[in-house]
Amino acid sequence: MLLSKDRNIVVPQEELDRQMEFCGLVHTVLETRLDGRRPLAYVHTFGCQGNVADSERLKGLLEKMGFGFTEEPENADISLFNTCAVREHAEDRLFGNVGALKKIKEKNPDFKIILCGCMMQQERIAEKIQKSYPFVDIVFGTHAAHKFPELLYRALSTGKRVFDIENSDGVIAEDLPLHRDSTFKAWLPIMYGCNNFCTYCIVPYVRGRERSRSSDIIISEARELVRSGYKEITLLGQNVNSYGNDREGEMNFASLLREINNIDGDFIIRFMTSHPKDCTHELLDTMAQCEKVAKHLHLPVQCGNDRVLKAMNRGYTAEKYLSLLEYARSVMPELSVTSDIIVGFPGETYEEFLDTVKLIEKAQYTSLYTFIFSPREGTRAAKMDDPVSREEKGKWFSELCAAQEKIAAARTSAMVGREYRVLCESKAKKDGYISGRTQGNIIIEFPADESVIGSFRTVRVTEALIWMLKGELAD
């Protein structure tokens, strides 16, 4: 169902102005309490790139409230964890980290502990924190992030715990202050939420339904990023291929890519994530025709067996998926494809798992993100019968990884001797070496001075190491 032009899912400017007033109030309170010392915040982000982008906005609000940042929670006045709900492992890690903060709180009662993000949108998690973690001060979900200044002010001024995990389809908050972690790589969210309801996935329940940002705003932000010297812009959405479907009269994702590609400047465009059922020939043709769009496609297949794909509610067959890859490579022979795979979905047999092994051999992925199925409470898959043991699934997982290693080794070995345009990103672990990425999103390390960081250089591949490359400057 299309949103009507009159439906308002954007946070009103009056509300944003109100939150800016709370930023000032927090600044005043802390300035008095700390005798003029600048308060420090420790921010830790779990999960996906969308969470990283959200944290940049939360850090922007913190800066507006007068905060600086520290890498050590012991030195901080507040500690903020932006959480992930996708896998059980993230939940275990979070509570392990939160428990460690209790000692800091005991030494410094004014130290504030804040939990936010996807995991906090789950009612059972909020209840667990309320009952078992009384030293946590503020909890808010994904739909209340723009109200962070108000929530912090309430906690500071009353000394009481503050919880805000309202359930809604979500909103879009534009024009929030932003603290970017990089000066040359930028995350640019184009939409939020998801309408797909894959049976194993909690995201639609914690992120809400799909909400596309205005293309005018996105293009304007991209233009400003290029003007500011950014060399890589990654467009973010749970399913970028659905962009515009919820806004009457809005352009689709392929058209948005073309518009950003037409911005003058030397930069590359990446995007994630694409859902195979919505990945069209139009989009693949657009990727091929737009010289600034990186020839890298992350296209999560999740499984290679049709019965399991149907149980996952993925909306495509293995044959349709492979046909899509065949077309993609016909228009982009240099395309690098990566994917996600879940091993041991409830009811999956070993024979069905072998269909996934066969699929990756046909797909020839550059790399894979593989996970053993992790049930998430509230999803349909969590209620499905799951007779295969974790130990047995672990054996399947190892078999899949071994098969992918051979594929990746062959693909990277074929790159030796060739030259690639690389964005130089950071110092490598080895002294005198720089780490960068090819357009195909493969890490390559090479000897160079730190002055090249943030620039494009041509690098010749001299050695392949399965998941990464070594090289030398060729320009």
Model feature map: region roles:
Residues 181-184, 194-196, 293, 303, ...:
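Short flexible coil/turn linkers enriched for glycine and charged/polar residues
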Residues 198, 218, 235, 271, ...:
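Conserved, mostly hydrophobic/aromatic
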Residues 237, 273, 301-303, 339-343, ...:
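Active-site proximal loops enriched in glycine and acidic residues that flank catalytic Cys/His/Asp
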Residues 5-9, 383-475:
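Terminal RNA-binding accessory module
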Residues 146, 196, 241, 306-307, ...:
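Glycine-centered loop/turn positions within well-structured domains
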Residues 1-243, 282, 297, 319-330, ...:
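Proteins enriched for Cys/Gly/acidic motifs involved in redox and nucleic-acid/cofactor modification
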Residues 110-115, 124, 227-350, 361:
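Conserved SAM/AdoMet-binding glycine-rich loop
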Residues 48, 244-261, 265, 312, ...:
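Radical SAM enzyme [4Fe-4S]-AdoMet core and its adjacent flexible, acidic
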